Amino acid sequence: KMYEELSPETREFFDFMMEGDLFDVFARPHKQVGGYMTYLPDYHAPFIFANFNGTAGDVDVVTHECGHAFQGYISGKDPIMEHSDITMETAETHSMSMEFFTNPWMEQFFGSRAGDFLKSQLEDAVVFIPYGSMVDEFQHRIYDNPELTPDERKAVWKELEQIYKPHQDYGALAFYAKGCYWQRQHHIYSYPFYYIDYVI
């Protein structure tokens, strides 16, 4: 109902996805972890993969990945395949926007607790902006100074935490307290310089 009411284009898109069985979103034993959208050019179709577990995170994932998929569905109609291949700088614009475009329908998922979800979503977005910016600045500093030792890299992270997240207190988590929290961010390893795109 949400995508049906959002716009005629999203209704057409979601019907296409459902009719084509283009979602694999329910968790099952031995299923690969993660959530993503990929485009299947031979079929002119987006495909969404996820692992729903009955939490509010499922709504975050489906709205986010449907943002990617809707972009793929719309641009995939162009007969020149290269036109549908968007840049890294714009890829997350569609997905992050869709998370907020669908807010008027959150009562369908959360009933009387929709306000709690929306408040949490806004808090997460506000907290994420400095964190995403910090990850990006960290990468620039590291790549601009490849000779930095592991301890110097940790010192850079700690310095940036004082700027972007001065409230951060790791308590007894000594590993993170000595500047190692960045190692949790797989984008730094797998997709360098992509993280700022979630903030744009």
Model-derived features: where do they sit?
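Cation-handling catalytic/transport regions enriched in His/Asp/Glu
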Residues: 1-200
